[in-house]
């Protein structure tokens, strides 16, 4: 694909580089040279790579987070109420049913995320 760049009437074709031109042998060697030392260090010191012996510094805030963002909290109720209101207003403005379906999608998304996070 050639793009044409014109300067005061004269045109000169400019070739656009392909995305795959970045995956040359030299670039792959540079990547390997950067990744292999880090991989070797992680192999010899796995406790540093995985933080196996670390303590959870955020454990004391679990009760506060569950009280603020849990299933029965007011924050979730306000988010759902705001979604209903915004969806209704957008439907009235555009007459597009997708905005009404957005309420159901957001509600399901919030329920799934709460279950995954453990709230």
Curated annotation (Swiss-Prot):
Residues 95-98 are cytoplasmic. One of its GO terms (cellular component) is extracellular region. The keyword Plastid does not apply. It is found in: Cell inner membrane; Secreted. InterPro entries: TraA. It comes from Escherichia coli. Propilin is the precursor of the pilus subunit, pilin, that forms conjugative pili, the filamentous surface appendages required for cell-to-cell contact during the earlier stages of bacterial conjugation, and that retract after contact is established. Mature pilin is assembled with the help of TraQ and TraX. The chain crosses the membrane at residues 74-94, 99-119. Residues 1-73 are periplasmic. Signal peptide: none annotated. Belongs to the TraA family. Residues 1-51 form a propeptide. It comes from the Bacteria. The keyword Ribonucleoprotein does not apply. The lineage of its organism: Bacteria, Pseudomonadati, Pseudomonadota, Gammaproteobacteria, Enterobacterales. Monomer. Interacts with itself to form filaments; also interacts with TraQ. Keywords: Acetylation, Cell inner membrane, Cell membrane, Conjugation, Membrane, Plasmid, Secreted, Transmembrane, Transmembrane helix. Its main location: membrane. This is Pilin. The modification N-acetylalanine is found at residue 52. It is a multi-pass membrane protein.
